[in-house]
């Protein structure tokens, strides 16, 4: 066990365009090699494409709805008991839910075939709202894993 204190949680400043912490966190997740301006262009470009598809919709609300449809409620964690390793289903904390949802949307977007990353992110968000897409499939697979291993739920710690 480490004797060091846990690092203090840093506050994330809301993004300049939408004044949303969730969008700022998404920009930070997309960012590679510290290039935040490029990450912002990708996210804001994706949001513009979402707005173009449905002018009446608020881009941030659409994104948050998509994030909610992708975020997992339960996941499995490995737990070793008496020489055997069990996949124990555990509930996901709200902060981790959001982080996993963002990570899965980005991973799914990076694997898509559209020409620009902005197009890929927009397409993945729109598919997530409709309940399809790779990110939603990842969530369903995670839930299936947890359901299949429900018998080991009593090994929770």
From Swiss-Prot:
Belongs to the universal ribosomal protein uS7 family. One of its GO terms (biological process) is translation. Keywords: Ribonucleoprotein, Ribosomal protein, RNA-binding, rRNA-binding, tRNA-binding. One of the primary rRNA binding proteins, it binds directly to 16S rRNA where it nucleates assembly of the head domain of the 30S subunit. Is located at the subunit interface close to the decoding center, probably blocks exit of the E-site tRNA. GO terms for cellular component: small ribosomal subunit. The keyword tRNA-binding applies. HAMAP family: Ribosomal_uS7_B. Part of the 30S ribosomal subunit. Contacts proteins S9 and S11. It comes from the Bacteria. This is Small ribosomal subunit protein uS7. CDD domains: uS7_Bacteria (cd14869). PANTHER family: RIBOSOMAL PROTEIN S7. One of its GO terms (molecular function) is tRNA binding. It comes from Francisella philomiragia subsp. philomiragia (strain ATCC 25017 / CCUG 19701 / FSC 153 / O#319-036).
